[in-house]
């Protein structure tokens, strides 16, 4: 399932913000969020992320596929990594907690002993992990939908990246919708020839063979497109001299305010958690019985 990150002007408040300020603020918020496991602090970032998402004026139809992928990733990480294996939990959760469900059984033939203990602490940690991932996802997910693809290059260049790296990032973001379009065109063409991907049956090898008519044309077309871009850049002697950009970006007062708020938030997070050790995993006393 490919996601088309299509941009269209919406006239939202978020689109007026300098794209450099948006990237800087999102990155700083990312580093601030990962400092905490306390739901009280994570709710603050989650509310900020939701407020930004609402301000973008994005609709469910536009972001439905992106949300589907995010929800699948979040569910997989929370259910498998936290509730079942506990490999992603912090030390407090790994210790014995207040059990809600206990399953202990031995696997026949091999004799493996399976122990599954679902505790209040694990459930609360799963909620914290979900808020953490969703907050980070919302801060970054809205960028491709609300940022003009023509200014990606100058945005990364304005953030201090070299011309080559800035242009590479620009091409990478432009390539996603192109790949989606090629995939859709190829799928429609193969369906016109009687290809039915929905009826994929059999084992792993049979399923791989079934998707070959889609993967091979899309991959070959992507390689040829990449070669065309490289040849065009070589013919224009890209990289020999400093690049000039058509678009120009200029910070405004609210851009500095957003960056300043993000910096202050990160500094506060660093001081609160690593220095004062506040914001670690926390379970409210009212949900623990007796």
Residue ranges with predicted function:
Residues 66-200:
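Juxtamembrane/interface alpha-helical elements of multi-pass membrane proteins
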Residues 44-50, 58, 65:
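Hydrophobic alpha-helical transmembrane segments of multi-pass inner membrane proteins, especially
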Residues 37, 56-57, 84-85:
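Short helix-capping/hinge motifs at transmembrane helix termini and TM-loop junctions
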Residues 1-39, 47-54, 161-164, 181-290:
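Transmembrane alpha-helix interface motif
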Residues 53-59, 147:
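Structural signal for the C-terminal ends of transmembrane alpha-helices
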Residues 22-23, 59-74, 254-262:
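Alpha-helical transmembrane segments and their helix-start/interface "positive-inside/aromatic belt" motifs
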Residues 11, 58-62, 117-121, 125, ...:
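Membrane-helix interfacial "entry" motifs
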């Amino acid at each position: 399932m490919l996601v088309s990150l299509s941009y269209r002007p919406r006239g939202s408040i978020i689109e007026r913000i300098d794209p450099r300020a948006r990237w800087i603020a999102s990155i700083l918020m990312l580093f601030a969020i990962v400092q905490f496991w306390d739901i009280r602090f994570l709710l603050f970032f989650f509310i900020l992320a939701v407020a930004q998402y609402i301000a973008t004026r994005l609709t469910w139809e536009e972001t439905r596929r992106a949300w589907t992928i995010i929800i699948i990733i979040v569910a997989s990480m929370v259910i498998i990594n936290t509730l079942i294996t506990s490999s992603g939990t912090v030390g407090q959760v790994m210790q014995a907690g207040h059990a809600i469900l206990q399953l202990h059984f031995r696997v026949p033939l091999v004799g493996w002993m399976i122990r599954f203990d679902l505790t209040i602490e694990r459930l609360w940690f799963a909620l914290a992990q979900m808020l953490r991932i969703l907050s980070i996802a919302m801060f970054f997910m809205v960028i491709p939908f609300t940022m003009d693809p023509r200014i990606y290059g100058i945005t990364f260049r304005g953030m201090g990246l070299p011309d080559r790296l800035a242009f590479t990032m620009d091409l990478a973001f432009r390539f996603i919708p192109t790949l989606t379009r090629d995939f859709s065109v190829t799928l429609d063409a193969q369906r016109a020839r009687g290809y039915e991907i929905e009826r994929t049956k059999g084992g792993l090898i049979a399923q791989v063979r079934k998707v070959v008519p889609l993967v091979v044309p899309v991959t070959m077309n992507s390689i040829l497109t990449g070669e065309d871009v490289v040849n065009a850049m070589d013919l224009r002697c890209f990289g020999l001299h400093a690049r000039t950009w058509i678009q120009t970006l200029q910070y405004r007062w609210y851009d500095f305010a957003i960056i300043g708020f993000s910096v202050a938030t990160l500094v506060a997070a660093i001081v609160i958690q690593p220095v004062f050790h506040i914001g670690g995993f926390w379970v409210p006393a009212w949900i623990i019985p007796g």
